[in-house]
């Protein structure tokens, strides 16, 4: 049986042994989280989109594709809009002065994002029947497929953006809150990045890649009008998926929906319609804008 003196001696020896073990233990090799850059952005008007709600962008060799958003069914009722006589939604190709070059009509509904690749536009619905509409340059629908990873018996939910990159389709998937890379032929998901939003900006919209391969995602707050709106951008490391930047916009900036990268600059469009806002509340409604550091 240990007396008090023996107990104290043993305790000191154990502590010394533990300290020595800690000094010789393998170092922590986990990759440290990168510092998150912060900053302010501003928008500058470039040109007006064709008449209608512009809610998606895609750069092409010929110019810029713009996705038309129409409000129909429950969406039209919610915004107090009449039911459109033609439910089809357009993909407009314009030059970099805003001149209309081509119009492709699609069966997308409440279109809230698009991509251009492999000679097709890929239109992302945010209303029943949901999914991605692949359409060729003659307006022929090649496919209509749901966003992957839905539960059995469910559709894939809505999307607020898409991007074509290196032969793959990236989708901003709303229901699972993921940025998904999908093989456009097999429709199998290959990569999933969590859409990280700050508590004050729970909404997410379109995504794009910059020249370094990093990912930018439009974010925003829940608000009742343009003055209350606080749009933002989240930047992800394109190799790790980790957040490396969070940016706010100067007051008076456009309300960004679509997002693209062209000639070293982020490009966006202000749809002129926003959940919870009066229609056309943004003074930049209908404008394509560039985004730059303030």
PLM feature spans:
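Conserved beta-strand positions in repeat-built beta-propeller and related beta-rich domains
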Residues: 50, 66-75, 83-85, 123-128, ...
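A short loop-to-beta-strand structural motif that recurs across blades of beta-propeller domains
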Residues: 89-92, 131-133, 178-180, 231-234, ...
